[in-house]
Each structure stands twice: as structure tokens, then as C-alpha cells.
UniProtKB/Swiss-Prot annotation:
<feature type="binding site">
    <location>
        <position position="18"/>
    </location>
    <ligand>
        <name>[2Fe-2S] cluster</name>
    </ligand>
</feature>
<keyword id="KW-0963">Cytoplasm</keyword>
<dbReference type="InterPro" id="IPR016100">
    <property type="entry name" value="Prismane_a-bundle"/>
</dbReference>
<dbReference type="GO" id="GO:0051537">
    <property type="term" value="F:2 iron, 2 sulfur cluster binding"/>
</dbReference>
<comment type="function">
    <text>Catalyzes the reduction of hydroxylamine to form NH(3) and H(2)O.</text>
</comment>
<dbReference type="Pfam" id="PF03063">
    <property type="entry name" value="Prismane"/>
</dbReference>
<feature type="binding site">
    <location>
        <position position="25"/>
    </location>
    <ligand>
        <name>[2Fe-2S] cluster</name>
    </ligand>
</feature>
<feature type="binding site">
    <location>
        <position position="6"/>
    </location>
    <ligand>
        <name>[2Fe-2S] cluster</name>
    </ligand>
</feature>
<dbReference type="GO" id="GO:0042542">
    <property type="term" value="P:response to hydrogen peroxide"/>
</dbReference>
<dbReference type="GO" id="GO:0050418">
    <property type="term" value="F:hydroxylamine reductase activity"/>
</dbReference>
<feature type="binding site">
    <location>
        <position position="3"/>
    </location>
    <ligand>
        <name>[2Fe-2S] cluster</name>
    </ligand>
</feature>
<dbReference type="GO" id="GO:0046872">
    <property type="term" value="F:metal ion binding"/>
</dbReference>
<protein>
    <recommendedName>
        <fullName>Hydroxylamine reductase</fullName>
        <ecNumber>1.7.99.1</ecNumber>
    </recommendedName>
</protein>
<feature type="binding site">
    <location>
        <position position="250"/>
    </location>
    <ligand>
        <name>hybrid [4Fe-2O-2S] cluster</name>
    </ligand>
</feature>
<dbReference type="InterPro" id="IPR010048">
    <property type="entry name" value="Hydroxylam_reduct"/>
</dbReference>
<dbReference type="GO" id="GO:0004601">
    <property type="term" value="F:peroxidase activity"/>
</dbReference>
<feature type="binding site">
    <location>
        <position position="493"/>
    </location>
    <ligand>
        <name>hybrid [4Fe-2O-2S] cluster</name>
    </ligand>
</feature>
Length: 552
């Protein structure tokens, strides 16, 4: 086992990364090894997808499978070895299908078959012990390479993994694009070649950022086409009396299915974590039994799910061990999510969830409502832009902070609470991702009717923040980096990595990230990123605010 993809990975003077019998996330070594092997075979699938495209062979089924299966290896998604082996076997079938199609076209056209990469050629074993024996070939730190080369490879690998997750979220909303899929395959195939070309690897990281910008636009279009444009909305965040289902993750299509299937059954539905923004979409407001948001960010789920007196559905990341809170018999997984022994739902029938919710007590009384305001995504931000611009011009608004990203359980993440609460009263704070839970239930007031705290939405809704920044730069006839805008991003896993690459690829500079740098980035690479982009780690709130606000 070697895994270094998330913030909680082991860090020691001897080296970084989880490499023992179990990772810090709870992932067993065998599970980690199977994930590595899956990625390796997927790189082989992509290698043949690239070659097949030379003959205009585009297999839409494979184009959607590869990012979906890749998503299953993201932090806190799938811990189920049996399911991972199914993905490996399916990937191998698809690899053979593309190989046969490509070689047939070569023969028909009198073209030599190309020499393929190792992931394209590996003869896959058929049983778990033999698959695990092959896993070292696929380890992310395979080979004897300089640590900077390895760091760049992993930056690309984890960034592309984040993009794959967003591609799958978009696909669920019927948003696919053959050109985007082709670019994805090209990068995936390249990473399977184990390049040692520093310039090419760095350029690829920027290509991943550009690719993800397109994917986020697709996802934005898919969500707004399906559910309307989010609008400022007050949301209750405490218990409501009655039977209950909690929906976590990111998949709003699953949420809609659950709402439709629970109509008239006396069950209240709550969102959790990154599903909170769903409550701002007009299409969901027609369901009176969607009563609010329960709980906070992913790392608190073992306590929050244990206390929730109903059924829980995990539609995507993040899942952690449900046995700790003794609720494994009432949590259900969907799509790419998996945990051994937990019921996995295939298809669109949520009867098992409904029956479980009806059999449980539910909340026995209403709590006094506690309301927060959400829904400041792209359309709402654009509608507010004229008022924001006017308040900048008259001096009422002097600075913008984007404070968001992934949450986590490290104590020093209190930094993000503190920088939001200590930001000057003449500043606006935009937030997104589950990092918002560090402060989204606090009161920030307003500036001439404009709320100081603007909740943009899920982590992928950084697309909305980018659109606002572009609009402001056009209004003030300046570059984005000349705006009084500071980005302070909390990172935990691979979606945050690809959002960062997206921003860097768009030329956004002077971003602060924290609380700790990714363990796979060497000191040399961090220095290069700071020199090239002004990217730096957070320090103290006082020092960072002084620098941001140019206080001597």
C-alpha cells in the first residue's frame, strides 16, 4: 500500500504517505492496492481509447465508465473490495473491446499497430489473490524516480481524479461531451506512460485545470437545466418532527428521486453536507417534505448519523466507517460509493430506504428553527453584481474574500472560522464546498442590503465564483488579479486539487491554501508554485489579513 492523496495521510521525517496495513481514512491496504490496479487498467483503457479515436471510433459507454470508475478511487468513496474488483474486471473487458476495434482498423487500413504502454498490455489476473500480487506494478510511487517527478505525476493524477468526479456528476445530469472525454483519455493515457518530463508534466497539470473548467461549466448547465437557477433561500438547520431520511453527497438526481418516492408517505427529507445547496433550486421547493439541512461537514458524520433517527443515503463522497456509530444497518450507498456490509442500491427504486425510515422513530419533536441563507450561485451573483459594483465604487465594499473548499477535522482548521469572522466589516465573504460549515451558521450582517456572507454552493460551484470575478474585472476594466479579491481555500482531497488547478490554469494568482500543503508536493514544487503563481500556505489569521489588506 502507498497512498498520499488526502490531507490526513501519514507524515513522518522518514517520508510521507500511508503505507501500512490501513490508511488514515480507514482504507485497508488490500483496498488501496485494488484501487491502484483499477487506475492502472483504466489508464490502459484510455490508451486504447486514444488510438481508437484515430479511426473515429468513439465508444460513449466507455467514455462514461472510465471517469466513473476512477471516481471510485477518490478519498472516502469506495471501501468495498468486491465492488472494486467488479470495476477492474469491467475495465479489462472494455480495454479488450477497444483493443480489438483498434487493431481491426489497423489491419483494414494497412497500418502498423502502435507500441502500447504497460497499462495497456498487462495481462490481468482473474482472482483476488493474484490481482493483489499484480498491484505493486500499479503503485503510484512505482519505479525509482526523483521526488519532484513523483510529486508532479501525483499532482496530475489526483487533479484528473477530481475532474473525473465532476465528469460523473455532470453525466448523471445528462451532460457529456465527446471532446472532453477525448481530452480526458489523452491525459489518463499519458499518466500511464510514467513520464519523467518535468515541463510536460507541469503543462499537463494546467491542461487538467482547463479541462475541469469545461466540466464545471457542463455541470452548472446540467444542474440549472434540471432544477432551475439557485435563488437566495432561507434554510432550517435543525430537527423537524416526523419520520426522516437524510441525503448526503452531491447527486441531486437521487435527491429528486427520493423526494418523488416519499411524497404522501409522512417522511421528511433532509440534506446533509454538500447536498445543502439543493434547497436553493426552484425545482426542489415544490416538495414541502424537503424540510431542511441536518448536520454539517463529512468528518462529523459518525456522530451526526448516529444521532439521526432515520435512514441515510450516501449518493457520493464522503463516507467513513458507519460501524463506529452503529448505524450500518440504516445507511445505504449509491453509484460509486461502497462500504463492506452496507446495503448498496442499484437502480432508481428507494423502497428499502423508505421502509427503513418508516420503521425507525424519526424525530419526536420540532426544534426551534435556526435559519441560514444559501443560494448565491451564478445567476443570483450576476443579478447582485450591479449593486455590488455600486457599493465598491462608493467605498462601502472594499474587499472580497472567497473562503471555502473541503472541511476536515484538524484543529488548525479553526483558521477558516477566524479569517471569516475577523474579515473587515466592509468586506464580502463568498463561500462554497463543505468548508462553509466552519462559519455558515454565524451572523455576518449586510452591507447596504447585500449579505456579507454569500453561500455559492457546492465545491464545483467555484465556477460561479469565477464568473463573478470575470464580471467584476470587466466592470472595473482590470485583470482578475488586480481585483480586491483574496482566495483562501481549504483542501482535503482530489476535488479541491482540481479546483486549484482550474484557478491556476486561468491565471488566478496569490491563492492561499491550508491548513497544510499536500504531502505529495515537495518543497521544490511548492517553491515553484509560489514563484510562478504566488500560491502559498496559510499562516496566522492576523498575518494573512495584514498581508491581504496591505496593512504595514
Amino acid at each position: 500500500m502507498f497512498c498520499i492523496q488526502c490531507e490526513q495521510t501519514i507524515r513522518t521525517p522518514a517520508g510521507n504517505g500511508c503505507s501500512y496495513s490501513q490508511g488514515m481514512c480507514g482504507k485497508l491496504a488490500e483496498t488501496s492496492d485494488l484501487q491502484d490496479l483499477l487506475i492502472y487498467i483504466l489508464q490502459g483503457v484510455s490508451a486504447y481509447a486514444v488510438k481508437a479515436r484515430e479511426f473515429n471510433i468513439i465508444d460513449a459507454e466507455i467514455d462514461t465508465f472510465v471517469p466513473k470508475a476512477f471516481f471510485a478511487t477518490l478519498t472516502n468513496v469506495n471501501f468495498d473490495d468486491a465492488r472494486l474488483i467488479e470495476y477492474v474486471e469491467q475495465a479489462n473487458t472494455y480495454r479488450t473491446r477497444l483493443k480489438d476495434a483498434y487493431e481491426a482498423q489497423c489491419a483494414a487500413n494497412g497500418v502498423m499497430v502502435a507500441e502500447m504502454s504497460a497499462p495497456a498490455q498487462l495481462v490481468l489476473a482473474t482472482a483476488k489473490p493474484e490481482l493483489l500480487a499484480q498491484a505493486p506494478l500499479a503503485a503510484p510511487n512505482r519505479g525509482d524516480v526523483h521526488e519532484d517527478i513523483l510529486g508532479l505525476r501525483l499532482l496530475c493524477l489526483y487533479g484528473l481524479k477530481g475532474a473525473a468526479a465532476y465528469m460523473e456528476h455532470a453525466r448523471v445530469l445528462d451532460q457529456t461531451d465527446a471532446e472532453v472525454a477525448g481530452s480526458f483519455h489523452e491525459i489518463m493515457a499519458f499518466l500511464g506512460e510514467d513520464s519523467v518530463d518535468v515541463d510536460k508534466l507541469f503543462a499537463t497539470s494546467m491542461e487538467i485545470g482547463q479541462l475541469n473548467y469545461k466540466v464545471m461549466a457542463m455541470l452548472d448547465e446540467g444542474e440549472t437545466n434540471a432544477f432551475g437557477h439557485p435563488e437566495p433561500t432561507q434554510v432550517n438547520t435543525v430537527a423537524v418532527k416526523g419520520k426522516a431520511i437524510l441525503v448526503s453527497g452531491h447527486d441531486m438526481v437521487d435527491l429528486e428521486l427520493i423526494l418523488k418516492q416519499t411524497e404522501g408517505k409522512g417522511i421528511n427529507v433532509f440534506t446533509h453536507g454538500e447536498m445543502l445547496p439543493a434547497l436553493a433550486y426552484p425545482e426542489f421547493k415544490k416538495y414541502p417534505h424537503l424540510v431542511g439541512n441536518y448536520g454539517s461537514a463529512w468528518q462529523n458524520q459518525q456522530k451526526e448519523f448516529a444521532n439521526f433517527p432515520g435512514a441515510v443515503v450516501m449518493t457520493s463522497n464522503c463516507i467513513i466507517d458507519p460501524n463506529v456509530g452503529n448505524y450500518s444497518d440504516r445507511i445505504f450507498t449509491r453509484s460509486i460509493v461502497g462500504w463492506p456490509g452496507v446495503t448498496h442500491l442499484v437502480g432508481d427504486d428507494f423502497t428499502q430506504v423508505i421502509e427503513k425510515a418508516l420503521a425507525l422513530d424519526g424525530f419526536i419533536y420540532d426544534e426551534i428553527p435556526h435559519l441560514i441563507t444559501i443560494g448565491f450561485a451564478r445567476n443570483a451573483l450576476m443579478a447582485a453584481a450591479p449593486a455590488v459594483i455600486e457599493n465598491v465604487k462608493n467605498g462601502s465594499i472594499k474587499h472580497f474574500f472567497l473562503v471555502g473548499g473541503c472541511d476536515g477535522d484538524k484543529a488548525d482548521r479553526s483558521y477558516f472560522t477566524d479569517i471569516a469572522t475577523q474579515a473587515p466589516d466592509d468586506s464580502l465573504i463568498l463561500t462554497l464546498g463543505c468548508g462553509k460549515y466552519k462559519f455558515n451558521k454565524l451572523e455576518f450582517g449586510d452591507i447596504n442590503g447585500i449579505p456579507r456572507l454569500l453561500d455559492i454552493g457546492q465545491c464545483n460551484d467555484s465556477y460561479s465564483a469565477i464568473q463573478l470575478a470575470i464580471a467584476l474585472s470587466e466592470a472595473f476594466e482590470c485583470e482578475i488579479n488586480e481585483l480586491p479579491l483574496s482566495l483562501v481555500l481549504s483542501w482535503f482531497e482530489q476535488k479541491a486539487i482540481v479546483v486549484l488547478l482550474t484557478l491556476l490554469s486561468l491565471g488566478v494568482k496569490n491563492i492561499r491554501t491550508g491548513p497544510t500543503p499536500p504531502a505529495f508536493l515537495t518543497e521544490n514544487l511548492l517553491n515553484i508554485l509560489e514563484e510562478k503563481f504566488g500560491l502559498r500556505n496559510t499562516t496566522t489569521v492576523e498575518a494573512d489579513l495584514n498581508t491581504i489588506l496591505n496593512v504595514a
